[in-house]
Amino acid sequence: INSSFGNNANNRAEESIGSAFDAHTAFDEHLLGSSSIPPVMGYVMIVHDCPDSRIVGRGVRSAHFPIDPAFDGASDLDRFLLLCDRLRRKSLYQAVWLVFANPEDGVAYEPSALLSYDKFIANIVMALGVHRA
């Protein structure tokens, strides 16, 4: 994600949650074949780490529902971290990898050990092992 961070955060949240829900529902309704083991799903997000994505407290508002306090005063990078952590904790995806990268200086980093490449690969391999057993 490289621009329009606020809009992109909302769109990526809707897409990632919706896609996971659709896949889980398709499995529950036996639309993915006869397997009794749910599909293995991973989610990868790479976000541009730049001054715009680090702005804290960008106005988050809702006309209909209260805003989760975790988002109060959060930068867009913080919001992406919250999204990816919740996708993992809620088991919407078996593996989630989050990277913040700045192509101008070549620096990339993983903001959470639980959302690292190593954990992503380990979780995918483990989940696929269940399918192969």
Where are the language model's segments positioned?
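A glycine-rich, hydrophobic loop/mini-helix early in the fold
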Residues: 1
